[in-house]
Amino acid sequence: MAKDDVIEVDGKVIEALPNATFRVELDNKHVILCHIAGRMRMHYIKILPGDRVKIELTPYSLDKGRITFRYK
């Protein structure tokens, strides 16, 4: 999939689930499931409930996403 096809949104982590999966509430109050991107996993970036994150969504499935950035 091309990089142009992704939708980037911001949200807040509300719950940590098993297997590096998180429940994230978007700024528009929708709640989706997200997993951590591979580079974040490689660099051991920890994500905790309450963190602000940037999420990439595909146009094919808007209820699952990938966490690509954790704001400070």
UniProtKB/Swiss-Prot annotation:
Keywords: Cytoplasm, Initiation factor, Protein biosynthesis, RNA-binding, rRNA-binding. Belongs to the IF-1 family. It is found in: Cytoplasm. One of its GO terms (molecular function) is ribosome binding. Its main location: cytoplasm. One of the essential components for the initiation of protein synthesis. Stabilizes the binding of IF-2 and IF-3 on the 30S subunit to which N-formylmethionyl-tRNA(fMet) subsequently binds. Helps modulate mRNA selection, yielding the 30S pre-initiation complex (PIC). Upon addition of the 50S ribosomal subunit IF-1, IF-2 and IF-3 are released leaving the mature 70S translation initiation complex. GO terms for cellular component: cytosol. CDD domains: S1_IF1. The lineage of its organism: Bacteria, Pseudomonadati, Campylobacterota, Epsilonproteobacteria, Campylobacterales. Pfam families: eIF-1a (PF01176). SMART domains: S1. PROSITE patterns: S1_IF1_TYPE. Residues 1-72 form the S1-like domain. The gene is infA. Component of the 30S ribosomal translation pre-initiation complex which assembles on the 30S ribosome in the order IF-2 and IF-3, IF-1 and N-formylmethionyl-tRNA(fMet); mRNA recruitment can occur at any time during PIC assembly. This is Translation initiation factor IF-1. PANTHER family: TRANSLATION INITIATION FACTOR IF-1, CHLOROPLASTIC.
